[in-house]
């Protein structure tokens, strides 16, 4: 199974996010300068909420012109199932995701039964951090808008995603950031926040 181990921290203030990304605590761990990636995401589900009932997420995201279809499923703690394929179209991506190990029910869905339900448009400020000799993570500051039901809300959050090594080192770094900047974990995904706008 594809896996993602991630901390998502609510920031809510653009100046605070900039302060965190430029802090010594972060910059002394940078492996390379920050990249700025423009992202546009559309989330899909069936009319009867087939994916929502299972707490699955299916999205089509363009990342600086590159299109990726991603499937995520619940996991334990900060780890989730995640599979992705480079594709501009859901119909060709569903069977490929299932072949990679995503739930097989995905392949049986009719693409025309899936409809956009909400979305997000944001800039991702991202770089790899070296936390310890054997542990690295991606730090991502996401700034933009969530959209759903004709409504829009500000998106401003920080993500830490384990790339290799020890989850305990990632947890310790996330806790250090939370303690230093009075942050809390964001319990809701971008999908959940955007979907709430449409309700």
Could you tell me what each predicted segment is?
Residues 1-199:
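Phosphate-end processing signature that detects enzymes handling 5′-triphosphorylated RNA
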């Amino acid at each position: 199974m594809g896996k993602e181990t991630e901390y998502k921290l609510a920031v809510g203030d653009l100046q605070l996010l900039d302060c965190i990304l430029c802090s010594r605590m972060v910059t002394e761990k940078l492996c390379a300068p920050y990249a700025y990636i423009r992202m546009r995401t559309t989330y899909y589900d069936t009319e009867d909420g087939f994916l929502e009932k299972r707490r699955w997420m299916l999205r089509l995201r363009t990342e600086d012109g590159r299109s990726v279809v991603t499937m995520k499923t619940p996991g334990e703690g900060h780890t989730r199932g995640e599979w992705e394929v480079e594709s501009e179209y859901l119909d060709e991506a569903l069977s490929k995701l299932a072949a990679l190990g995503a739930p097989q029910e995905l392949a049986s869905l009719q693409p025309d039964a899936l409809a956009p339900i909400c979305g997000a448009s944001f800039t991702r400020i991202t770089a790899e951090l070296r936390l310890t000799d054997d542990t690295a993570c991606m730090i991502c500051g996401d700034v933009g808008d969530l959209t759903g039901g004709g409504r829009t809300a500000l998106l401003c959050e920080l993500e830490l995603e384990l790339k290799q090594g020890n989850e305990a080192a990632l947890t310790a770094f996330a806790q250090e950031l939370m303690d230093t900047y009075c942050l809390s974990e964001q319990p809701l995904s971008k999908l959940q926040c955007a979907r709430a706008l449409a309700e």
